[in-house]
């Protein structure tokens, strides 16, 4: 759902109700300039906060209040583990508008799970492919990719609510909260309100999902994602 002109420096307000009261160490995965990490740090009173992103320009212009900003590909073996060794463990991991851009987000979630302590929290924002605009385009055969948004041409994976929850739980994390973001389309908000939420799967633009780590080993997702794309 990235907007290349402003995503890297925008704050994701819809996920704020899911934030823990306190978080000592924050890792913002694919977080651009680290704006969210900096904002959440202020809210949660964090001692350590940093960002990792694949875009050199975003990291070059990262928020200077952060403790670290790393330019690297989180899908490459050893990258997440190296960040953990130097700066972890992280009791809050942010994955905001990034998982849909990855070839194997299931494997990344498993690696992030492994660098969280018991009681740690992961929060993801994931676009909803069941949104009425996507359904309309499939039915009319007008699926045209764009530079950003729901039809971002760099999206590699697509999720509805159930598969987004499955993604977050693939390695043993437990989802305990899911919030819906409707976007700014007035008619979608009216339809959602009049239907008392029954049209939620179609009016929801994005899901904000919170998952927690409890005691126990990290489960290997294996080929979990090979048969799940929506």
Language model regions located:
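Conserved N-terminal segment of class I S-adenosyl-L-methionine
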Residues: 1-88, 92, 106-109, 124, ...
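A short beta-strand submotif of the Rossmann-like class I SAM-dependent methyltransferase core
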Residues: 92-98
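Short N-terminal helix/helix-N-cap motif within the alpha/beta-hydrolase-1
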Residues: 103-107, 134
């Amino acid at each position: 759902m990235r907007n290349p002109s402003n995503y890297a420096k925008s704050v994701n307000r819809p996920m704020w109700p899911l934030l823990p009261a306190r978080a000592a160490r924050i890792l913002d995965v694919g977080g651009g300039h680290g704006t969210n990490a900096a904002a959440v740090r202020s809210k949660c009173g964090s001692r350590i906060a940093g960002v990792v992103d694949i875009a050199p320009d975003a990291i070059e212009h990262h928020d200077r209040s952060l403790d670290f900003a790393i330019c690297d590909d989180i899908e490459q073996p050893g990258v997440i583990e190296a960040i953990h060794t130097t700066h972890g463990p992280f009791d809050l991991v942010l994955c905001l508008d990034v998982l849909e851009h990855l070839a194997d987000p299931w494997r990344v979630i498993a690696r992030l799970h492994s660098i969280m302590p018991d009681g740690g929290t992961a929060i993801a924002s994931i676009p909803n492919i069941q949104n009425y605009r996507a359904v309309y385009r499939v039915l009319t055969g007008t699926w045209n990719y764009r530079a950003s948004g729901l039809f971002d041409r760099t999206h590699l994976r697509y999720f509805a609510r159930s598969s987004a929850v499955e993604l977050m739980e693939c390695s043993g994390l437990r989802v305990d909260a899911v919030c819906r973001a409707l976007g700014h389309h007035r008619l979608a908000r009216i339809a959602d309100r009049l239907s008392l939420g029954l049209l939620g799967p179609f009016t929801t633009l994005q899901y904000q999902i919170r998952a927690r780590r409890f005691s126990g080993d990290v489960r290997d997702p294996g080929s979990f994602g090979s048969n799940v794309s929506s």
